[in-house]
Amino acid sequence: MKKRWNSVFKLVLMVTAILGLSLYVTTSQGVEVRAESITQPTAINVIFPDPALANAIKIAAGKSNVTDTVTQADLDGITTLSAFGTGVTTIEGVQYLNNLIGLELKDNQITDLTPLKNLTKITELELSGNPLKNVSAIAGLQSIKTLDLTSTQITDVTPLAGLSNLQVLYLDLNQITNISPLAGLTNLQYLSIGNAQVSDLTPLANLSKLTTLKADDNKISDISPLASLPNLIEVHLKNNQISDVSPLANTSNLFIVTLTNQTITNQPVFYQNNLVVPNVVKGPSGAPIAPATISDNGTYASPNLTWNLTSFINNVSYTFNQSVTFKNTTVPFSGTVTQPLTEAYTAVFDVDGKQTSVTVGANELIKEPTAPTKEGYTFTGWYDAKTGGTKWDFATDKMPAEDITLYAQFTINSYTATFDIDGKLTTQKVTYQSLLEEPVAPTKDGYTFTGWYDAKTGGTKWDFATGKMPAGNITLYAQFTKNDNPNPDDPTTNTPTGNGDGTSNPSNSGGNTTLPTAGDENTMLPIFIGVFLLGTATLILRKTIKVK
């Protein structure tokens, strides 16, 4: 029985090894695994429940009716599929088209691209005009070379970051603001991103194969990232916010450029009767381009525009319209520059009568000044009154349409006065510039108290009638002078009572005790020696008895 089980065990091990080896060989040789497949002939409209898509499959498979059955081999024979503007709402079933290379689904009502996620052979994908909003399902389709996502309601192009073989990309008519995920698409040759919300072209700076950029109707103001693109042939930039076209001056292959109808809005400046504004419009050489028209009777003397205004207005403006020449082409460059004006008001900062001021536009935040300092006080904030009033919040409170004064307010500080009597400490809390309360004069045997000083020895005596608390903690030290005779009223103090020869006088001792004379200090020595000898003899005697 035991041998039988051993044989079975060996057989199982052998089968497992063979299966494992087969799996390794299969995977190592790169055999393609189908994403999904049907196992038996099935009606087209069962596999593809959307009627419009089923009809497109019928045509692609060469069938006469959507109820006809197809096999997986039939589906594998479909390499391109078109369902243009037919009202497709779902692409369920497309996951079985394992050899699909080209897919056109323009102008439908598709919202979910999940069935596409494993169709890795697709090279051309046309999805424009669908309310997709999210295209994360195509993030892994690295074979795609042409992708059209025009008017698909997408805002995030992050799923496109890994499509490294992408050569042609349409992103027009979407609310896209950030194109940073495109920075790694180094094979990109054609990019169309018109009518979006793009303002920064920096992610394109390293796309050296880019030949065509269509970016009309955006919010682009800086085109300097395009200066590093040597193969750029065609650039469309009309209806943007571009004021300086000099970055394109040295682009040697540039033949087609559109730069008309730029709308430039400068940062607001304060209104002045005599307003001077620099001209921001620059041509290919970097030199200013003279205005074509100037509002409000303004004048131009390069590089500045000047207006003499009699009263406040919200803005002034000027237009430009001039042909500019690049290496291979001359094109019109036109637009309008608007200079917003802010009516200026004065915010005065008052620190105990000393004033500074800043000019601030109405409804703008006031920049908080450096907190003032005042000896003996703590700054509590800026208020709209000298005392009381409301504290100004520089994070939220905005300048009214009038001049204002803000007052620095302070609270007086309290400090600690420490009284030190030979290391024994007591304290008082005293407000700045107030008088200290004089403690009770301390006493010390044999000494006379002389006062409180600002040092342990020496120093300056504190005058409690006039000395005021400084802006800091202080320590005052009790100082004393030693008395010459600690008890001058006692005639017996320090009076000797002996006979004059070093011996005591019994009659003056007040008792019968005899005090030792000068030679009696060693009278205990004989007693000690006697006790020692007695103890030694006793010890010797005890040892002698034990021996016997």
From Swiss-Prot:
It is a peptidoglycan-anchor. It is found in: Secreted, Cell wall; Secreted. Induction: More prevalent in stationary than exponential phase (at protein level). Single gene transcripts are substantially decreased in a sigB mutant, induced in mouse gut. Induced as cells approach stationary phase and by growth at pH 5.5, at 45 degrees Celsius, in 7.5% NaCl and by oxidative stress (at protein level). GO terms for cellular component: extracellular region. Residues 483-498 have a biased composition (Low complexity). Keywords: Cell wall, Leucine-rich repeat, Peptidoglycan-anchor, Repeat, Secreted, Signal, Stress response. InterPro entries: Cu-Rt/internalin_Ig-like, Ig_E-set, Inl_IR, InlB-like_B-rpt, Internalin_N, Leu-rich_rpt, Leu-rich_rpt_4, Leu-rich_rpt_typical-subtyp. Residues 504-516 have a biased composition (Polar residues). Residues 519-548 form a propeptide. Disruption phenotype: Increased expression of InlA. No change in invasion or bacterial survival in host mamammalian cells including macrophages. Decreased bacterial counts in blood, spleen and liver of intravenously inoculated BALB/c and C57BL/6 mice. Increased production of host IL-6 in liver and spleen of intravenously infected BALB/c mice, but not in macrophage cell lines. It comes from the Bacteria. The modification Pentaglycyl murein peptidoglycan amidated alanine is found at A518. A motif (LPXTG sorting signal) lies at residues 515-519. Residues 1-30 form the signal peptide. Residues 480-518 are annotated as: Disordered. LRR repeats lie at residues 93-105, 113-127, 135-149, 157-171, 179-193, 201-215, 223-236. The N-terminus (36-79) resembles a truncated EF hand, the LRR region (80-262) has a curved form while residues 263-343 form an Ig-like region. Contributes to systemic listeriosis in mice by decreasing host IL-6 cytokine production and thus evasion of the host immune response. Does not contribute to invasion of the host intestinal tissue. This is Internalin H.
